[in-house]
Amino acid sequence: MTFSVDKVRADFPVLSREVNGLPLAYLDSAASAQKPSQVIDAEAEFYRHGYAAVHRGIHTLSAQATEKMENVRKRASLFINARSAEELVFVRGTTEGINLVANSWGNSNVRAGDNIIISQMEHHANIVPWQMLCARVGAELRVIPLNPDGTLQLEMLPNLFDEKTRLLAITHVSNVLGTENPLAEMITLAHQHGAKVLVDGAQAVMHHPVDVQALDCDFYVFSGHKLYGPTGIGILYVKEALLQEMPPWEGGGSMIATVSLSEGTTWTKAPWRFEAGTPNTGGIIGLGAALEYVSALGLNNIAEYEQNLMHYALSQLESVPDLTLYGPQNRLGVIAFNLGKHHAYDVGSFLDNYGIAVRTGHHCAMPLMAYYNVPAMCRASLAMYNTHEEVDRLVTGLQRIHRLLG
């Protein structure tokens, strides 16, 4: 299938709107991606004609809704090449998925004197849950340091592992720098030391194929809203043997086998014992539509288009005076920058006046900001619906801001 950005853009209603009297150039998909009509329509159709509470209902609507929900679990398992759909837990997003692992697997397997390894480029969602776990149990949090070019000091990693290392929690792709970490060698090293590996895939799954069996990671988590799906839904993958051993971290309906006031409660099997309460079924249906949409386009086709666009953007940005770029030359999805000594918020506000949407701030990565000794950065993210013309508008906008502000 030939990739056509014009055809893709036609599927996204919001891309036809104007902002401040100018066509919208949406360069903030790393924060949250826009939704195609196919996703919007699938969720709306479910609420119009097929909504019911899932599980245990004997009536037709309930049975059909349950089947649709479980079919999305199967589709998601194929999307990341999991061995079984029963290795996938529906969560609200990447943040909840990581917290689930920290509170279930972590509470059961990390003890005083143990250690967990993360990196200096992590999103707060892959830092704070491990800080909280370490504080609860008396474990140590170890950190892989950054290089100035935005890659990790991987030569330091072997020295961080010892017999007390229980987990390596690492991002697949940095949400600020676009750095894609060499997961295969990192996972192999962790397993050689008897440690498990959690991968934060929030910034990876929309850019190229992910194969969790080939990676051999123990946990992989991502959000639907960055993958052109709805908010409030995500996927946590856990190797089946691990998942079956993990205790639930939330109690309620749907996750029990039996409940007795005198004899206590027993749990249903995984993954359902991690899905307490009424699920976000509409969001799950929308996620299924997003997975179908992206799969039909072909992730390899998307990757080729986006990489060409990224190379173009990096080359064109060289023409902007006093622009500082952060991150390696080979990157996925995002370009973080600052313009002279101007605060990122000011630059972002000017760009918004030109109809260009970028993200500004610390990007939930304060340790990374501290490493570069800046309070904030601007971040332009490139998705499959962005164009060379939008890149040109960004470059022209930055040149104009430089002339205005000096």
Swiss-Prot record:
UniProt superkingdom: Bacteria
Chief place of localization: cytoplasm
The record's annotation in SUPFAM superfamilies points to: PLP-dependent transferases
Active site annotation, chain numbering: 364
Q: State the InterPro entries in the record.
A: Aminotrans_V_dom (IPR000192), Aminotrans_V_PyrdxlP_BS (IPR020578), Cys_dSase_SufS (IPR010970), PyrdxlP-dep_Trfase (IPR015424), PyrdxlP-dep_Trfase_major (IPR015421), PyrdxlP-dep_Trfase_small (IPR015422)
Which residues, renumbered to this chain, carry the PTM N6-(pyridoxal phosphate)lysine? Answer: 226
Reactions this protein catalyses: (sulfur carrier)-H + L-cysteine = (sulfur carrier)-SH + L-alanine; L-selenocysteine + AH2 = hydrogenselenide + L-alanine + A + H(+)
A Gene Ontology annotation in the biological process aspect, one of them, is:
cysteine metabolic process
Q: What is its EC number?
A: 2.8.1.7, 4.4.1.16
Which keywords does this chain's UniProt record carry? Cytoplasm, Lyase, Pyridoxal phosphate, Transferase
Transferase recorded as keyword: yes
Q: Where in the cell is it found?
A: Cytoplasm
**Which is one Gene Ontology cellular component term of this protein?**
cytoplasm
Cite the annotated pathway.
Cofactor biosynthesis; iron-sulfur cluster biosynthesis
Q: Which cofactors are named for this entry?
A: pyridoxal 5'-phosphate
Subunit structure as annotated in this protein's UniProt entry = Homodimer. Interacts with SufE and the SufBCD complex composed of SufB, SufC and SufD. The interaction with SufE is required to mediate the direct transfer of the sulfur atom from the S-sulfanylcysteine.
* Function comment: Cysteine desulfurases mobilize the sulfur from L-cysteine to yield L-alanine, an essential step in sulfur metabolism for biosynthesis of a variety of sulfur-containing biomolecules. Component of the suf operon, which is activated and required under specific conditions such as oxidative stress and iron limitation. Acts as a potent selenocysteine lyase in vitro, that mobilizes selenium from L-selenocysteine. Selenocysteine lyase activity is however unsure in vivo.
Stated family: Belongs to the class-V pyridoxal-phosphate-dependent aminotransferase family. Csd subfamily.
> Under what name is this protein listed?
Cysteine desulfurase
Protein species of origin: Escherichia coli (strain SMS-3-5 / SECEC)
